[in-house]
């Protein structure tokens, strides 16, 4: 660093959207102190790596990122979920400057200060009111809580991030309002268990504008829906009170989209996972949700090859999917995670069987997705534009979250802008995407 110049930070953010929000908070604090962001590791005074430690494959990706930072720079600070159990990092890279777990923002800042002290300029404000975002300007993740009270056997998130800690409703709403004022058109509500929001606070009220708002899933969703942006709900568990939120979707207050991680359908597997096993009742609820809100899109994730999963269990899952008709689906092959209680379960499934089941499930889902998307041909859909080209733009409908769902490719005779919301006539559908033309031309 040259004498008098601002110190530069290079940042690597790995893992889920919750970790991305953690990265945004750290960067916002550092920018407020005058730090600049470097495009490359070798041009930075220090590198921060926000790790993921959920799966062994994610740990390997984190270790690889740390190794690259050490090779290209040498001054590396490690934080995030993998940092909660630092032994593996310390063994592989004993020269890292600091290792901390998730949400330990102050410890990260202290490590940065030790490695490269800030230059204070009281006349310069480097941070906009909405903070520093790592997403495109037109959408942002809004984290409403940390941690989780569930104890699924395959998951170590409670060990890494602790039990549920919800933010006061007014705090969430103030952040959301700042984001919308800064140009954000879509708020993606995230947590480990969004529908449990406020349980730890006993649904306490907090002051928002001229009224009090309870820290309750329904109340928060209703208030967010008044801010003038798309509101998309992720990581929702199918608790009974979710039915009330579907009512808000039917009224057009929040997007008709639910991201619910069902993980499986077989009662035997769900019991081994320690997840709600009444998936037959869930099918009835899905039908009632769609009756109340016909445009509802459902996204979910599933695990195949969980210990003890039999051919009959897997066949049950495929039949369940045919009836549920999940719109968007992600599937993972089970892999052991250090510290997870599922590691000790009997009847581990061979890797080749996991792969066969993954292939079969994704093939089945491809047909379901194509069938559901075909029904949208001839309709008009609102599309938020993510990328623009000379004649065709890439965007998403209300049924598509960024990065994980499908896309809508639209033609237009006029230039479109990133973040613009247009109405398009859908003319064609394939397995995962839609194609159309901006209406009015």
UniProtKB/Swiss-Prot annotation:
Q: What note does UniProt attach to the cofactor annotation?
A: Binds 2 [4Fe-4S] clusters. One cluster is coordinated with 3 cysteines and an exchangeable S-adenosyl-L-methionine.
Instruction: Tell me the lineage of the source organism.
Output: Bacteria, Pseudomonadati, Pseudomonadota, Alphaproteobacteria, Hyphomicrobiales
Q: Which domain of life is it from?
A: Bacteria
Report the GO terms under cellular component: cytosol
For this protein, the record's Gene3D superfamilies field holds: Methylthiotransferase, N-terminal domain, Nucleic acid-binding proteins, tm_1862 like domain
Residues in TRAM domain copies? 374-440
Localization recorded for this chain is: Cytoplasm
Q: Which family does it belong to?
A: Belongs to the methylthiotransferase family. RimO subfamily.
Specify which residues bind [4Fe-4S] cluster 2 according to the UniProt entry for this protein.
148, 152, 155
User: What species was this sequence derived from?
Assistant: Bradyrhizobium sp. (strain BTAi1 / ATCC BAA-1182)
Q: What is this protein called?
A: Ribosomal protein uS12 methylthiotransferase RimO
- Keywords of this entry: 4Fe-4S, Cytoplasm, Iron, Iron-sulfur, Metal-binding, S-adenosyl-L-methionine, Transferase
Q: Which SUPFAM superfamilies match?
A: Radical SAM enzymes (SSF102114)
| Cofactor(s) listed | [4Fe-4S] cluster
